[in-house]
């Protein structure tokens, strides 16, 4: 499809073309005001009272968009990415026209395009503030989240994310969403049933942004699915509450993973945000099946998907944020619910140790600075990039080390012996682990050395030679 909008239709004489060049252009663009007026007028006609009171015979026409009108309004959609055009649409009260279309039209394609144009316009701060301050428009847009048309839902989610990302108006939208409990149900339904990965990712970004902006809203949504049998007093109930939000997040994550695991970042971060509050952790681990499924998904990601032994170390730069979220959630589940069957030490500890150490080793490679760089970036740009990389890698390292220390504390003599035999606790890997755990986790490493000495005294002695501080303290 041609994404570059065309000027007004041909057929004008030279005098008319000069008029367009002289005063009919929108801002500094070549787009015609007169042509745009015509398209918007056509939109008004579509939703005018005489057209909306059609008989049942015309129902099909109401849900289909005329090809010529679709082409023209799509050009406006393209054009609205230009700030001059967006401002002109704002001055012409185009948002009110689009609101009328959304309130009255049953045509999915037309609704999608109108929300898409508003989404483009909202990318500019002044217009975003204006759109957000219109209560009626806000209500109509939120109502679009109840739509059954995936493209319309996608554009609505994109618009919401744009507004939520503007600090000046974000709180307005959070408050509106809190006032509409049905939005929670709609979003849960999308996450649990949609196979449209683009939509799932965008809805996930909206949820992630909402939770990041407002912990109260996150807690409300987490608690929203807690169901208690009406005929059973809560204090006598042995049934665990059913949390709807977490299973829906899990279903969305599975669907996204099936198409592209690299897009999982947003759903992993949502789970990470949930683990920052006690109710969020409980929502994960106190639903046995869901907790097990989440653990299995994340366990499989770190053991068989991300940052594998045959991947180049530099892959860590692409995967550092998703790995931080995944390991953070695994660590929270591991620390809070160790009695669960799926967390039995002999089943998970050695594969996790192997994955944790592998990521730490790749991190060491990534942080090695090349002596001579052929890149032409300025020193200031390089310094900024390295600072950002170091920041994210430091967050990841802190998460890895805390998780690794918790696993080390739970190791038994039998598990250590198995790890030495199978290679997860080789001299090289233990050295990498110690190098990262010391000095902050010295007591944990010292206790591990004591167990290791019972299993393989020579290996324990070699490690103590490489880390003299351990020998002094033991």
From Swiss-Prot:
Tissue expr: Highly expressed in testis and ovary, and to a lesser extent in the lung, spleen and the heart (at protein level).
Record's subcellular location: Nucleus
Keyword Glycoprotein among record annotations: no
Comp. bias intervals (Pro residues): 1-10
GO biological process terms held by the UniProt record: positive regulation of synoviocyte proliferation
Residue segments, region Disordered: 1-21
Residues recorded as bearing Phosphothreonine in the entry: 387
InterPro entries xrefs: ARM-like, ARM-type_fold, Synovial_Prolif_Regulator
Keywords assigned by UniProt, alphabetized: Nucleus, Phosphoprotein
Modified residues (Phosphoserine): 6
Origin superkingdom: Eukaryota
GO cellular component terms, A-Z: nucleoplasm; nucleus
Task performed by this protein: Plays a role in promoting the proliferation of synovial fibroblasts in response to pro-inflammatory stimuli.
Similarity comment text for this entry: Belongs to the SAAL1 family.
Protein name as catalogued: Protein SAAL1
